[in-house]
Amino acid sequence: MIRTTGIAGAGIFLLATMLSMRGKPTLSEISKDSSADYPAKIERLDPASNALIPEHAMWHPLANGFTWVEGPVWIHSGYLMFADIASNSIRKLDANGEVSIWLQPSGYRGQKPYGGTEPGTNGMTLDRTGRLTVAGHAARNIMRFESMDPHGTVTILADSYQGKKLNSPNDLVYDTDGSLYFTDPPYGLRTQSDQDPDKELKINGVYRIPNALQHKAGAPPDRDRLQLLISDMERPNGIAISPDRKWLYVSNSLPKKWMRYPLKKDGTVGPGTVFQDASGDTRVGSPDGMKLDTRGNLYATGPGGIWIISPEGKHLATILTEKATSNVAWGGKDGSTLYATTTDAVLSIHLNAKGIQP
């Protein structure tokens, strides 16, 4: 999630004040989008993209009226969930296109006013038993819901490293062995900066929770087992694992690059390399959330929209959204629908590829 990186602390608080004055969108203002489908603009850079994107691909507007949404995840019983960060809520988009609040507050629950612009949660995924696992963002933890009852048991899987609070976990992915990987930039802190007074860690890391799948429901975090894998990224953000389990992908929002790390048998990683460099692209948006299809192609939000990058690192195409795009998720009846969250809306597009779903 990226919104205000590089703005001085005073600017952050001014923006927070402006948002407070205009008010958070109410549920009545947020609803299914009744506007018509429209042709997707595709920047095709390689003929291989033709096998992935239909010639007449269409965007389907699903919901609008937000300030900034993130973390879409398809629930196998047939609906989409996503994080409405500014309103500190997790929302549900049902099969009829109706939007409802699933949980509020979802992230920050402190006694004093939050003071920043992003009090909610962020990325979401499912473990292989179907339990919703959430990057807490302003809550500064990783949490797992033991059922789809938002007021049921919630298990905190991680909240600190070596005795210091996590910054603001942003996005996450499960490995096939049940381990959980997540990124931890400062975007959920009040000033979103490395100088934030609440920031306890000097790094913005990428972590692994070994065998998170087996963590007992309701048990406290096993803090001694949390592994720091990557500590030299400025703004780690989106994260994904290749279908052959050979590579860990991490998007770095500053500078605008996607990194790739060899994934070892023990779950740790080797030295990373730049997988794709977008630092020269001045279009709106930066590397953020991403997912893979079954062929290993990466669908990564970035400048201009959604970049499709081959397993060899070739930029095949960009599906243009022409607005800041935060994340994507595969879903739908056949797993070929790609859902996207943007500045103010949730959209979907049907592709020829089939996605890897949690």
Regions found by a protein language model. Give the residues of each.
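Position-driven detector of the extreme protein N-terminus
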Residues: 2, 19-22
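N-terminal compositionally biased, intrinsically disordered segments and leader/signal-like regions
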Residues: 5-6, 18, 27
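Sequence-structural signature of mature extracellular/luminal beta-sheet repeat domains
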Residues: 21-358
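Bacterial N-terminal signal peptides that target proteins for export
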Residues: 1-10
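Bacterial N-terminal signal peptides
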Residues: 9-17
